[in-house]
Amino acid sequence: MMIAGIDEAGKGPVIGPMCIGGVKIEESRAHILKVLGVADSKKLTPKKREQLASQIKKHADGFFILEITPAQIDELRKIMSMNEIMVICFAKVLEQLKPDIVYADAADVKAERFAENLRRQYAKTNPAHAKKIEIISMHQADAIYPVVSAASIIAKVRRDELIEEIKKEWSVDFGSGYPSDPKTKAFLLKWGKEHDGKFPEIVRQSWQTVENIREELEKAGKK
């Protein structure tokens, strides 16, 4: 029986893409993930995550990483919530893996509702399999199921790679890209001042952080 885990990396940042990782492995071999030392990606150092990501890909029966750009996120947010975006993204990863059982980190305050919505979305492209597949959705699933931890790790490593590529390409250092990061805020404020309140394509324009900075700049300009 094939099991899979799905998790995201980069749902909250104001800068950079979001990555959804999926890992599939034969249930009888899933213990190897524990042997490798797979754990919640947030508790691992970047170097350890990179090492584990390589091992996970080597031992898994399948894996897939979906990358969503800031522009794609902004477009989707015009017509739906972030939770609805997560359902669509998780379903796209599920389409690539098609396991018998999937463990998903719930991107909804109600885990059961997330599972139902995921099944409904998946059924649009895989109606027959959607009836048979077992979907287990839980909060903090990456801390409970090693297969979800594995998915979280490969997603996080890929996002980190993309963030480093962005920093090199744009010759900027904006820190982690999270709204709570002072370095990220300072970068956005400086860029906004220098570019008349306009931000580059690496920034999620629909984030409240960006709106707040625009308002701040507008007020400062009126003084």
From Swiss-Prot:
All residue ranges annotated as the RNase H type-2 domain in the record: 1-219
Reaction(s) the record says it catalyses: Endonucleolytic cleavage to 5'-phosphomonoester
GO cellular component: cytoplasm; ribonuclease H2 complex
GO BP annotation list: DNA replication, removal of RNA primer; mismatch repair
Subcellular location field: Cytoplasm
Sorted UniProt keywords: Cytoplasm, Endonuclease, Hydrolase, Manganese, Metal-binding, Nuclease
Record-linked PROSITE patterns: RNASE_H_2
Keyword Nuclease applies: yes
Cystine connections: none
Enzyme Commission number(s) from the entry: 3.1.26.4
Listed SUPFAM superfamilies: Ribonuclease H-like
MF (Gene Ontology): manganese ion binding; RNA binding; RNA-DNA hybrid ribonuclease activity
EC category name: hydrolase
Cofactor: Mn(2+); Mg(2+)
Binding-site residues for a divalent metal cation, renumbered to this chain: 7-8, 105
Protein task: Endonuclease that specifically degrades the RNA of RNA-DNA hybrids.
Family, similarity comment: Belongs to the RNase HII family.
Name of the protein in question: Ribonuclease HII
Naturally occurring in which organism (per UniProt): Methanosarcina acetivorans (strain ATCC 35395 / DSM 2834 / JCM 12185 / C2A)
Protein's gene: rnhB
